[in-house]
Amino acid sequence: MGFQMSVMCIGQLAMQAVVNSLGTAAVAGYTAASKADQVSVLVNNAMMTAISNYVAQNFGAGKRERIRQGVRASLLQTETANIMMCIGILLLRNPIVQMFLSNPSSEIYHYSDLFLTIEAPFYFLLGLLAVYRTSIQSMQNGRAPFMACMIELVMRIAATVGLARILGFTAVCIASPMAWFGACVLLIPCYYQMMKKLTFAE
């Protein structure tokens, strides 16, 4: 988890560097939107803690079917929460910004709206990433989550630094969804391959 947080921080630094180059309105809009965005991160982290303990206990007890059932239930709960947060943030994005900024300008609203409108619909990817990565880690596979972290880092930096000249602030908005997608492409097949092997061993 410590390494994952370090990778996340490095990616956030790259995103912040690009935002800083776009002016004060972009910085203010991004900062306010990021605070709202952190709600989703906190909720998904809570789900990660729950599924981590559940999978680890059942993996140790050799209860493969309970792992499968628990992961499915966790996915349902996590994605339900993410859908609700997405809808809430999209409907209340301007009042949310006003909670953190007094009298924000139309330009600040433009940046915060753009960030939340692009990123919020992809919270489901963050949910998939949280559940599958934690489940894999809890089954004593550290390699795949490590590789997923590196994919996240590379894609987040590539999106912000590589596409900033072409897309500007939009590059920052798509960076996290791209990183989540890249990590999911690795982790989801990995989880099901592991479950097949565990079932076969049983």
Spans of model-derived segments:
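Structural signal for membrane-spanning alpha-helices in multi-pass inner-membrane proteins
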Residues: 1, 5, 16, 42-45, ...
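Hydrophobic faces of transmembrane alpha-helices in multi-pass small-molecule transporters and flippases
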Residues: 1-14, 18-19, 39, 43, ...
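Hydrophobic alpha-helical segments typical of transmembrane helices
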Residues: 2, 14-15, 26, 51, ...
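Helix-terminus/linker motif at the lipid-water interface of multi-pass membrane proteins
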Residues: 6-35, 39, 57-58, 95-105, ...
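Small-residue-rich hydrophobic transmembrane alpha-helices
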Residues: 29-87, 91-93, 126-140, 144-148
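Short runs within selected transmembrane alpha-helices of multi-pass transporters and secretion channels
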Residues: 45-48, 119-138, 144-156, 172-188
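Short alpha-helical transmembrane segments in multi-pass integral membrane proteins
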Residues: 55-122, 163-202
